Amino acid sequence: MSDKEHKLIGSLKQQLSDKVMDRRDFVRYATLLGMAAPTAYMWAGKITGEDFVPAARAQEIPKGGIIKIAMRVPKVDSPHTYSWVYDSNITRQVCGYLTRTGVDNITRPQLVSKWEASEDLKTWTLTMADATWQKNRGGAFTAEHAAWNIKHCLDPKVGSSVVGLMKGYLLKEVDTGTKDDAGNAVMTTEIWDANAIEIKDDKTLVLNLKEPQVAVPEHLFHYPFLMLDPGEKGVFGVGSNGTGSFELTELEVGRKAILKRIKDKPGYVDELHFIDLGDNGAAVAAALASKQVHGIYEGNIEQLEIYNGMEHVNIHKATTAQTAVARMRLDHDQFKNPLVRKAFRLATDSEKTLQIAVKGVGSAAEHHHVSPVHPDYKKIDTMARNIEEAKKLLAEAGHPDGIDVEINCKPDPTWEQVAVESMVEQWKEAGIRAKITVLPSNKFWEVWDKVPFGFTAWTHRPLGFMVLALAYRTGVPWNESAYSNAKFDELLAKAEGTIDIAARTEILGELEKIMQEDGPIAQPLWRAI
């Protein structure tokens, strides 16, 4: 990691000493600023007077054999535009990331050996590790390769969600010179400066930002941000090149993906098989019970008792920021009025939906997509269910007799459909009549960001502002609601460059309030997994 201590580390030490932040957040931010993880753990223990080291891993791990995992097997041909985590689970066995955020939420080097941030957090120097490609005679992975991948992800023609993370500090909006149907200028993005992504030498890449950003190393582990062989032009498939230990040898979408470890490459297993068992959660549980598979990507909450009864299965519970939101597209007339959107939130009983959909395994959400597990979460007034107020808002918006809508969802995992059914029943009391359209998962993936009203799952991110940037920043690829709020964008950019926990928490509180009053979602719950 960095050879010198960043100026802001002193502030982190003081915040830890003053108990403004806890030890885990100290380690997280210290490592983001370039401190090696062991050093950060040492300082956390020294300042608090308590031992604080990550749990040791077992040293004796058997080698060889085949591991089979039950998981959906989708198309994986365009890694930089992946929409779901399990897409990347196949590709990441072949291709690496520049960094890696572990289960402890600490980000460490992977294809970089270290990074250094300037005092103002606007210049990030990345030093490449000694990694090699599997093919092309085993040539070195270089700064030029990293730069190509970053530029490819930021190309608006590609449509990568990386744009949502980096738009605030590496991109600028430009006028395309064309108008939309309403006569407004059609905008696009481009890299903000010719030297924004600067190759110093084969080992050194410098990111020159237009705004300060503390989470650059975490952004580099966004799951579509895989480092692909530039010679393959962003396309991935059977036999593709990578820097990892495995090669994809077979792929049948909807059935299986088989990866084999390359001779002399590091690793413990010889082969890794992903087996697609479809939308039926019972089939997944049966496969695990009969030991046809060794593990599963995700199990349905309805089968929790079945899993608990399997002697050969260990179950661990973790509180997360995993969720799903009922999101409305603002470019559809039904949802343009913020009073209508707020009425959906006021008509939702989050606690009841939590109990029905996931048996209470999680916590009720507050309709702003920032979780209590995030270090920058701000506790604001709860938006309690209020049917009379919801009816009033609908009437003010021109719907005195209620409103008819259609909401799309998928059947797998089953809790998502159950959550939608629960909310739809609740909305009836406010005069919201919702038709539920359940699409097969593979069809839902094709339209998840296009349907006027849909229930979309969002995975955990370590910081509160990260999913806000991905999902609600104006004009970014994963802004499935077409939400646009200038004040929201301004506060979001401010939060991204603020390292002081207390100060950033206050900014997040303002963002949370905007989401509750003006936002495009009704969010019932957070999942524990």
Q: Can you name each region flagged by the protein language model?
A:
Residues A70-E119, W148, N241-G242:
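N-terminal lobe/hinge region of extracytoplasmic solute-binding protein
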Residues G102-I106, T178-T204, N208-H273, A282, ...:
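Gly/Pro-rich hinge or "lid" segments in bacterial periplasmic/extracellular proteins
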